[in-house]
Amino acid sequence: MSLSPSRIRLLDSVTVNQISAGEVIENAASVVKELIENSLDAGADEIHIETLGGGRGQIVVRDNGVGMDPEEVPVALQRHATSKIAHFADIFSLASYGFRGEALPSIASISKMEIHTARAGGLGSKTLIEKGEPVCCEPAPRQQGTTIAVHSLFYNVPMRQSFQKSPQMDRLAIRRLLENSVLSSEGIGWTWISERRQELHVAKKQGFIERVALVLGESFVQEAFFIDKQQGDLRVLGFLGSPNQHRSTRQGQRLFINNRAVESSFISKKVAEAYAWMIPAQRYPIFVLKLFLPPMWCDFNVHPQKTEVRLLQEGQISNLLVEAISEALLRRSSSLEEIVLKVPTEKIPIENEGISVPSIRPAIVSAPLSCPTFSQQPYLKTEMATIVSRDSASSSLSVVEKVRFLTSLGKVLLVEDSEGVHVVFVQAARKHLFYVSLLSERLESRLACQTFLLPPSVQMTKLEADFLQMRLEALTALGIELSRISPDSFAIESAPPFIQEEELKEWIVALAQEGALHVGESFEQLVENTVQKLVFSRNARAFDYAWLDILWKLGKPEKAFDGEMIRRLVLDDDFM
């Protein structure tokens, strides 16, 4: 029977904790976060995590921290029981992760929990907790430290269960959380066992650079700019991704303030402003930045999960960031200028034109790159693209007009056929061709694929690589053959034509990233979304326009699959 709205009652402790859990515990990753932060605050330097069912079946966190005496366990299960602060003012000088004393009772109120703990020289105890209350406590010897096992998460709050995402999404959230923990906490060893398989292992002796390479890949570290700048009590340390390394979302950005993973639109904006002239619009740089600020400048008590931060003295922080980033980018710019000045000019042949154009090409990559026309590339065995009619109504494609390249005007080309002169928008045209070659079953045409004699490799996070591994057959059906050469990288055996190697690699990483993030989305929709965001016009090879013939074989469409303009006939009215 419902209570009268006019009567005011005190809520029981279980209900209070369950309400609090709704704020603090969003999903299984939230539980892992709170438990490992307890381990870190307890001084642990070895933390072992095990999860089943994406964490909803079981979460076990084992550490070698200071541990607890048996009589401390029931106290730790009460709300606002903490060893971190005594007064509100202490929040602004915190060096610990937790301070509210809400996490453990909140988790215990929506799960079945077991705590096995011992202090140095202590006997050790094991406590069973159900619905937030200890039901059994017995002596249980163990070495110094604590093991907390959480079973059947949300078992007694079915409404919360119905709002949970898939176990795969939970695993993704846990992986990102643990990757951030690996980056933020040097001197700590980490092991994560997911579904009885080791997903992550980092020795405590591994340094910051090794950890960045583990999380973001060795290729990121090799191309990134290292920064380390200090002004008084302020310091910024980390890696800024090369301008060639950018993504369609901010997922590649890792920010830590005083070793706490946080989000800050202010800092993200400052970094983006520094890259504005180097990367395409609506793309985001990759970075790993660690800021060390006076604790009284940071308010982490903004969000229950402490993922947001309010900052004081933004002007000083901005000055430090701008100077550090500018110095790093200027160092790279200077080194590139020196390389360019040392490279002699050479002539690039233009197929079927009989003329040559001087070009300066800096040798800034490990393997020599050349700029011949597409059909002359020595590292590709390219089959001439063929158009296969799937319907008698499309038989008109067999009559193909000749198209002649006239000139390039930056992002557009002028070409000529029997109808007249056309303006072709390079980005939209090449994007459309790539899309046709991927999803031709939807468009009645199919373009042949190119096979790499020396397969390039592409690197990503292990979770993203696992997503691609599950989609290898679907990718092969699209003409992309990948072979896994390490836990976090693939070799590209073959791919659709008319896309440069770096663009192809960028698209594969984007597909893996989007697929890992949006588990419920169809593969075809993921392909379409990521192709739409891909930038084709950047660093296009000079006079490599063999793809124009294919565009004309497709009937010289005026608009791309997403409605973007591909070409327009130049009319007399344009000159009046």
Swiss-Prot record:
Listed InterPro entries: DNA_mismatch_repair_CS, DNA_mismatch_repair_MutL, DNA_mismatch_S5_2-like, HATPase_C_sf, MutL/Mlh/PMS, MutL/Mlh/Pms-like, MutL_C, MutL_C_regsub
GO BP: mismatch repair
Family statement: Belongs to the DNA mismatch repair MutL/HexB family.
SUPFAM superfamilies: ATPase domain of HSP90 chaperone/DNA topoisomerase II/histidine kinase (SSF55874), DNA mismatch repair protein MutL (SSF118116), Ribosomal protein S5 domain 2-like (SSF54211)
GO CC terms, sorted: mismatch repair complex
Organism in which the protein naturally occurs: Chlamydia trachomatis serovar L2 (strain ATCC VR-902B / DSM 19102 / 434/Bu)
Protein's UniProt name: DNA mismatch repair protein MutL
GO molecular function: ATP binding; ATP hydrolysis activity; ATP-dependent DNA damage sensor activity; mismatched DNA binding
NCBIfam families: mutl, PRK00095.2-5
SMART domains xref list: DNA_mis_repair (SM01340), MutL_C (SM00853)
Upper classification of the organism: Bacteria, Pseudomonadati, Chlamydiota, Chlamydiia, Chlamydiales
Job description of the protein: This protein is involved in the repair of mismatches in DNA. It is required for dam-dependent methyl-directed DNA mismatch repair. May act as a 'molecular matchmaker', a protein that promotes the formation of a stable complex between two or more DNA-binding proteins in an ATP-dependent manner without itself being part of a final effector complex.
Record keywords: DNA damage, DNA repair
Pfam families the record matches: DNA_mis_repair (PF01119), HATPase_c_3 (PF13589), MutL_C (PF08676)
